[in-house]
Design a protein with these regions (language model features):
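Flexible, solvent-exposed loop/hinge segments and secondary-structure transition points
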Residues: 22-698
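C-terminal motif of bacterial Sec signal peptides marking the signal peptidase cleavage site
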Residues: 12-15
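Bacterial signal peptide processing site
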Residues: 17-21
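N-terminal non-cleavable signal-anchor helices
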Residues: 8-10, 209
């Protein structure tokens, strides 16, 4: 991967031109419009087979012109895989690494695994481009790379981590929320085989300004990320993907480089349309490409049958799995429609209507949340979102767009809802957040199993080592081996947490109740505590230098690592079943291999470690949690926190936020002057109000 050091910022490139000559801005504007698409499609735009064929063919044309061989995937907005194409000579496998450009060695986690199918990398990149983007923002895998690393921006020192630190381990193949592909295009949202991707070369696709899907390309054999934002890369994956999206590119005014996050400009791409050496007119039909030996559609077990390209779904119609909700159910306290949306199955039934809990918080069934309370929580949170100013959407002043999930103390989904045009990634993530806050607030549980006991029952994480190069599919399984070191155990994180906090019974059934919001748990999951200064110790749920990377983050990955490897083995054709729809309790590459032992629903789709959730209490009794995701993390915090507070005020049933004296920010951590954070709300959050500090004192 060659680096081209530039001192010009992206806006200067747009204004003055860069790359292959002419005006960069003019070329980018032209990339948005597809002359061949004559019929207007708005508002019901979707990717037709002709669109999918064109996107793939344009990628192949650019790769061929550069003498490269690529693997290309196209998905619709909810993750239906519409095409996977592999050029002759393309690498069958990629290596996961965060150190390809930066040097150094990281041992453990997913680092250095070199037997990952290139098809899975391409699919995850395409899904990332689709899931992070909406009609108000267009983010790419390069944007993802920028916002998930240990410092924001990457390459800077002594600054906090990225706002979406940890989001890469969402949409997991073992998620109990994400759908699984069938023989036909069907209702989503669907899983991503490797979670979300930070490897440049994944872009959203648009028609008439409407987000309709994503494209992912892998050609360099490396599944990595960009650790330095002080330059612009020449990245072959990204260049080919830029060619693929010609005519289907995001409107320039909503691209990531038009969005600021805590005062820093997001990055959309380091490659531009005027750098291409092919044009859309060079694209040949897939039949012609097959006939001349350039490449073919390829089957990917669990995702795509390889027979033919497919049309996508119309987002917002029942066929997509997301549709408008009943306005008489999702309404504010005055009966006004909240313009909410819900997730539906293939029969157009709401997958997650509000329902009463069946747990017994504090040993009493009367403490369990009722269906009416759950619906009010969803409505109040959506109402707060509709009143709030978005962080990552254009134009400034747009409403926040999010997904909300409510769970009981066992992690069972009690209800989900979303606002119009919220990014898809927020669905699975909001559920992760709700479950994580609830789970880690379970110290002193009088009913059910305490978190420490559940974690101690999880099988050990079985890190694998890379296999000899070049990877031979016929001997791959025989060459797989478990690393001797590091060899983490999940129970080790429990011990580390208790020691770090100075609370020996934290997470235990006998301990005093402590309420952890996701912001609190996220503080404990950073490679340095407190988040930012690089001379602090690793958080107890993180890892030390030499072991930590975005592909080896600590408990968040180790809890689901075995399940991810189970899925990779299944796709590779190893004679094992696909991973169950529960990310916990997988034995991994052990004897017996890929079995489930002591699985639990509390974290069934994995845990999340960036802000946007709070536990829900009735008095001083934990009764569940709420998670919000889709916009800025401070907005997510506020929507969840105020949603619970306003529900409590409206219903007067004792439901509310955790009492202040129980919150994690009250813990005095030994040898630390910085306390955990609970929630952080925007200073001036509402569109039509000058109200400030809206969460203070609550």
């Amino acid at each position: 991967m060659k680096r081209l050091t530039l001192v010009l910022i992206l806006t200067t490139l747009y204004a003055c031109g860069g790359g292959g000559g002419g005006s960069t801005l003019e070329a980018e504007v032209q990339s948005v419009n597809q002359p061949e698409v004559a019929e207007e499609c708005a508002p019901d735009c979707f990717l037709q087979t002709s669109d999918v064929n064109q996107v793939v063919a344009q990628a192949v044309a650019e790769a061929s012109a550069r003498g490269e061989a690529a693997t290309i995937a196209v998905v619709d907005r909810v993750g239906n895989v519409l095409a996977v194409y592999q050029m002759t000579g393309a690498d069958d496998f990629v290596t996961i690494t965060s150190t390809f450009d930066a040097g150094g060695t990281i041992v453990g986690g997913l680092e250095s695994l070199n037997f990952i199918p290139a098809t899975l990398a391409a699919i995850s990149k395409a899904i990332t481009g689709a899931y992070l983007s909406t009609s108000g923002n267009a983010f790419t895998t390069r944007t993802a790379s920028q916002i998930i690393q240990e410092n924001f921006n990457p390459g800077e020192r002594n600054v906090p981590s990225g706002p979406l630190f940890g989001v890469q381990f969402s949409q997991l193949p073992c998620s109990d929320f994400s759908q699984r592909a069938s023989d036909t295009v069907s209702t989503g949202p669907f899983r991503a085989p490797l979670g979300l991707s930070a490897d440049p070369g994944g872009f959203p696709l648009y028609k008439e300004g409407i987000a309709v899907g994503g494209v992912g390309v892998i050609a360099d054999g490396i599944y990595g990320l960009d650790k330095n934002l002080n330059d612009f890369d020449t990245d072959i994956d990204e260049l080919i993907a830029v060619a693929a999206m010609q005519g289907y590119a995001a409107p320039t005014e909503i691209r990531a480089d038009q969005v600021t996050i805590v005062g820093k400009t997001a990055r959309f791409s380091d490659s531009f349309s005027d750098e291409l050496i092919s044009s859309p007119s060079d694209a040949q039909s897939l039949e012609a490409l097959s006939a001349n030996g350039t490449g073919n559609l390829i089957a990917v077990q669990g995702y795509f049958d390889g027979d033919r390209t497919r049309s996508g779904t119309v987002f917002g119609n029942p066929e997509s799995g997301i549709r408008p909700a009943d306005p008489t159910v999702f309404s504010d306290s005055n009966g006004n429609s909240l313009d909410a949306f819900i997730f539906v199955d293939e029969n157009n039934n709401n997958r997650y209507p509000a329902r009463g809990a069946t747990d017994t918080p504090g040993g009493l069934t009367t403490n369990a949340m009722t269906a009416a309370e759950v619906q009010t929580l969803l409505n109040e949170a959506i109402n707060v979102a509709n009143l709030s100013r978005a962080q990552i959407r254009v134009p400034v002043g747009t409403q926040a767009r999010v997904t909300i999930s409510v769970v009981d103390t066992n992690g069972k989904i009690l209800g989900m809802g979303r606002t119009r045009d919220g990014p898809i990634f927020g669905a699975d993530v909001s559920l992760q957040k709700a479950r994580t806050a609830t789970f880690f607030s379970g110290t002193g549980r009088l009913s059910g199993t305490a978190p420490a006991e559940l974690l101690r029952g999880v099988p050990a994480t079985r890190y694998l080592s890379p296999v000899p190069q070049p990877v031979d599919p016929t001997t791959l399984v025989a060459n797989l081996a478990v690393l001797d070191s590091p060899a983490p155990t999940i129970s080790g994180y429990v011990d580390a947490l208790q020691e770090f906090l100075g609370v020996r019974d934290a997470l235990e059934a006998t301990g005093a109740v402590v309420a952890f919001a996701d912001r609190s748990g996220g503080n404990l999951s950073r490679p340095n505590y407190p988040d930012g200064p690089d001379n602090g110790p690793p958080g107890p749920l993180s890892k030390p230098p030499g072991e930590w990377s975005v592909f080896s983050v600590g408990l968040q990955l180790d809890l689901v690592y075995n399940a991810i490897i189970n899925h990779v083995a299944f796709v590779l054709g190893v004679p094992v079943p696909d991973v169950p729809q529960n990310c916990t309790g997988n034995t991994g590459f052990a004897d017996p291999a890929f079995q489930q032992v002591n699985a639990f629903e509390n974290l069934a789709n994995g845990m999340q470690i960036f802000p946007g959730s709070v536990p829900i209490f009735r008095g001083d009794i934990l009764i569940g949690g709420i998670g919000v995701s889709g916009d800025g993390v401070d907005q997510d915090d506020m929507i969840s926190f105020l949603g619970v507070h306003r529900t409590g005020e409206q219903l007067n049933t004792g439901l509310g936020n955790a009492p202040q004296e129980l919150r994690a920010d009250r813990i005095a951590i030994p040898n630390q002057t910085s306390r955990l954070r609970y929630v952080s709300c925007p200073q001036l959050p509402f569109i039509d109000s000058s109200q400030t500090e809206v969460c203070d004192g609550l």
